[in-house]
Each structure stands twice: as C-alpha cells, then as structure tokens.
Design a protein with these regions (language model features):
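Conserved N-terminal beta1-alpha1 strand-loop-helix module at the mouth
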Residues: 1-75, 80-82, 86-92, 150, ...
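Hydrophobic faces of well-ordered beta-strands that scaffold small-molecule active sites
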Residues: 4-10, 46-48, 73-75, 95-97, ...
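Active-site beta-loop-alpha junctions enriched in small/polar residues
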Residues: 9-15, 51-53, 76-82, 100-102, ...
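N-terminal active-site wall of soluble small-molecule enzyme domains
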Residues: 50-125, 144, 158-159, 179-185
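C-terminal helical cap(s) of enzyme catalytic domains, especially alpha/beta-barrels
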Residues: 66, 168-172, 225-247
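Catalytic cores of alpha/beta
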Residues: 81-89, 141-151, 195, 199-213
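Glycine-rich phosphate-binding active-site loops on the catalytic face of alpha/beta enzymes
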Residues: 96-104, 155-167, 212-231
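Histidine/lysine/aspartate-rich catalytic loop segments that bind and position anionic ligands
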Residues: 133-185
C-alpha cells in the first residue's frame, strides 16, 4: 500500500476563537498560524468546513488559507448556492460536499447521494468546470458509491463515525467490513478514497485493514490533544513572566 496522507481539520481552532473574539481580526488563536503548525508537524492538507451558520470558520478564513498555505486546502461545505458560488470564486484544490443541519453539533452522517444525485451532479459539474476536485462525504454503503460515480465525483470520503462510536469489538468489526467493501468498490470505480470522522489515536489502527485509503481527515481529536499536550508548557511560561511582578 502507498503512504497514507493526513488532512487536519482546523474548524475547532476557529471554534475557540469565535467563542471569545467573533468580530476581531487579530483574535486568537490564529487559524492560519495553527494550520501552518500542523503542516510543520507533517499535515499533508488542511480541511476547513464553511458552514451556513458560520459557527466557526468564516469566509475570510478560507480566503486567507487559500492564499497562504503551501499544502492543498480541502473546503467542506453543504450544497448551498451561496457557498458554491463562493467556492468557485476562491477555487480551493479540493471540495468535499457534506450534509448539514443547523441544530447538529457536528456533521452527523454522510450525504445521501442516492436521493440527491441529480442536484449533486449539477453542482459537481460546476465545481469541476472551475478546476476543483470534488469529494462526497458518504456512509460506507455500496449504493452511495454507485451514486457518487453517477454524480461525477472525483473522490469519496467514507464516514468513519459509526466505526468510531462502536461500543464493542464485534460492532467495530462489522463497521470495518463495511468500510472495506465500500473502499474496494470505490477504488474499482476509479474514485480516490479518503476517510474521516471520529478518528482518534485509539481507533486509528483498526482502519489499517481498509485497503486503498489515500487520506485520513482528523480534526477534533488532534486539536483537543494539542491543548492537553501544550497546556503545561504554556502555563509554565506564563507563570515565569508573572514572577517579574515581585521584582517591580
């Protein structure tokens, strides 16, 4: 098998920023800086989800990332006219079309390519005509693979959330087999196969059984781990500066 690439989803860097500094351009944490730190650590691409409600990533983030990254930008988005038009203007290298509900905490499952095949095909054609490679975020289901092909997608991203949330080994094995079959079929149909959602250090190795994977997209887990791993040093350095108070 070829080397497996890692895409880092930086949405939750923006989540932290928006919780405190929604309208301030110099707010922290800086999304571009954090994206570049991920790249220095070995990230092969950066993913950002521009949601309709703009709860974390904003339009200006996408523009800044596109103009400054030295790795591909993968823009996640719903099939919504306004965001499609924006994407065609910005032209990220990759777009991943995902389902979206306003009341969800995060994307809850794959897009239904079977039910929305005609609408998706129109959007995918527009995006591909603009020189953008298009992926569909789908559940590991063979009918969804067939419809992804019919839509004209270049790639699929297999939803690994059900695998990640499996409560026991038997359930995990069932989900791995679904992913294996979906990946094999997608590969046979000429689609690049990526995977993402809920992937952690604890469940990563189970995915090594899935053939033909090109890239894993991981976000929340790595951002959360970065907070834990980096918090001690950050507090230590801050406290060192505070010691100067006694010397004034």
């Amino acid at each position: 098998m070829s080397d497996l690439k890692l895409g880092i989803n930086i949405d939750h860097v923006a989540t932290i920023r928006e919780a405190r500094y929604r309208l301030e351009k110099l707010a922290e944490p800086n999304v571009l800086f954090c994206a570049n730190e991920a790249i220095r650590g070995g990230a092969d691409s950066i993913t950002a989800h521009l949601r309709e409600d703009r709860r974390h990533i904003q339009n200006h983030d996408i523009v800044t990332l596109k103009e400054n990254l030295n790795v591909p930008l993968n823009l996640e988005m719903a099939n919504v006219q306004e965001i499609v038009d924006f994407a065609i203007e910005i032209k990220p290298k990759f777009i991943c079309l995902v389902p979206e509900k306003r009341n969800e905490l995060t994307t809850e499952g794959g897009i239904n390519a079977v039910s929305h095949e005609k609408d998706l095909a129109k959007t995918i054609k527009r995006l591909k005509d603009a020189g953008i490679m298009v992926s569909l975020f789908i559940d590991p289901d063979l009918d969804q693979i067939r419809s992804s092909v019919n839509c004209g997608a270049n790639m699929v991203e297999l939803h690994t959330g059900t695998y990640a949330n499996a409560l026991n080994n038997e359930a995990m094995d069932i989900e791995i087999q679904r992913l294996v079959l979906a990946s094999e079929m997608a590969h046979e149909e000429g689609l690049q196969v990526n995977a993402g959602h809920g992937i952690t250090s604890a469940n990563l190795e189970g995915l090594f059984e899935v053939p033909f994977l090109s890239e894993l997209n991981v976000g929340h887990h790595l951002i959360a781990r970065a907070l834990v791993i980096g918090l001690r040093e950050t507090v230590l350095k801050f406290k060192e500066k505070m010691l100067k108070y006694a010397n004034n």
